[in-house]
Amino acid sequence: LHLLSRRQRQMCIRDRLSAIAVDKGVQPVIVCTKADLGEVEFLRSAYERSTLPFIAIRYDSGEGLDEVRQWISGRLCAFCGNSGVGKSTLLNTLLPQAERETSAISQKLGRGRHTTREVTIFEAFGGRIADTPGFASLEANRAGFIPKENLEHAFPEFGPYLGQCQFTGCSHRSEKGCAVRAALAEGRLSQTRYDSYCAMYEEVKDVKDWQRPKV
């Protein structure tokens, strides 16, 4: 769940979370809870090319809420995102008896105050919802570590182009004959998603085997 202002920081956190989920075999669903801020179509376009489900919420009309309920049904779901993006507001709308505290966004910092301080699990719609505390940042080499050789697989839209690069072990950043970069240049991949991939790769590229977190 992500607030759609402060675009660059939010995009990195969103893409890191989704990449970690994909790497761990968990289905991420992108839910925009501030759909009235005018950037929904920008994100919708990026995620249509990513193959990840995208839901825009409009509280005035109820748009998107049924889709969220359907994803919860029969599953254990976690509401994740940085502070102030609307996790508690969405939970209160879906499940009024949850009575989660909410807060406004700081205009100076561009993020909200932590109102959820522990993980709480709620039974709802034939499934379960885990409401998690927010956070201010997410480092790729610490939170849900993904080795550099696996990172390309955490971005599903890269899939059709993997194995087509000129060089084995291509990092898809600067090499000649890179099929991923060619797809990006042709508009078949989202520039913002690609930028997130590069930022994550930069953080983990020099991590040695002995430095990697133990699974």
Model-derived features: where do they sit?
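Phosphate/Mg2+-binding loops and adjacent switch elements
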Residues: 16, 22-24, 40-42
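Polybasic, low-complexity association/targeting segments
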Residues: 80-81, 86, 114, 118-119
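Helix-rich effector regions associated with P-loop NTPase G domains
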Residues: 6, 19-28, 35, 50-53, ...
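Canonical P-loop GTPase G-domain recognition
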Residues: 36-85
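Single conserved hydrophobic/aromatic residue that forms the stacking wall/gate
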Residues: 1-9, 13
